[in-house]
Amino acid sequence: MTIRDTGGLMKRTLILFLMLLAMAFPALSQAAGEGGERILDYAVTARVEEDASLVVTERITVSIEHKAIIHGIYRIYPVKIRENGDVLRHYGFEVLSAKLDGKDTPYSVTEEGYTAGVAMGDPESKAPRGSHTYELTYRTTGHVRFLPARDEIYYNVTGNFWKFPIDHVSFTLELPGGASPEAVTAFTGALGAKGAEYRMTGPSSLETTGALSPGEGITVAFGWKKGIVTEPEKNLSDFMGDNRALTLSAIPLFQLLLFLL
């Protein structure tokens, strides 16, 4: 009579099953993560007006699962930044329209500190599940820099405040008279990073070549020959208002100069 070692066979089968499960678990976890809420596509067109303002349209396609996105999305836009130490640079910001899948959608704007927040969506109802596109159009000022050799914009396309991954970003610049830029560069990654995960898709357009993690974005710099855009008159009162600390610190020096005269 032959006695079979079924216990050993069962043990080996169990070990093999556990090994296969361990190998499959990371893939399952990654697939689950990729299926979460995220920005699928972020397409931006910026038109430079002759008065140096920008009219920007952002088409943001998102995957909605009613986890973090319930009523809509929230775009945070920087309206003030510190440059060269204590100099405060101010960006004008005016929303022109907000749409969801091509139709007007409610929106509200709140400004706090150095940022303006735009809430897009109906606060009284849930946003539709699935893949949907929000379109935000706004006018902004202060982004064109008038340099000795050329003029340029230095523009944070997406901002660095999104809590979702961004799969793909594209950016197109439109200059007055159909002019083309002479110099283009871009930076990807966290605020201040110098990543270069992008490629040019035309003389005035580019796109990212890799996904952006939450908190990451893309900043572009486009330069063109002088004379295409009119430089606005410098407003001293605006500078003094935005840089109150510098203005006040200069008063004693001004008083001293008057005394010496």
Features from the language model and the residues they span:
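Lumenal/extracellular ectodomains and adaptor appendage modules
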Residues: 27-260
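Bacterial N-terminal signal peptides
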Residues: 16-24
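Positively charged n-region of N-terminal signal peptides that target proteins for export
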Residues: 2-13
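A short catalytic or substrate-binding loop motif that flags glycine-/basic-rich loops and adjacent residues
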Residues: 13-14, 38
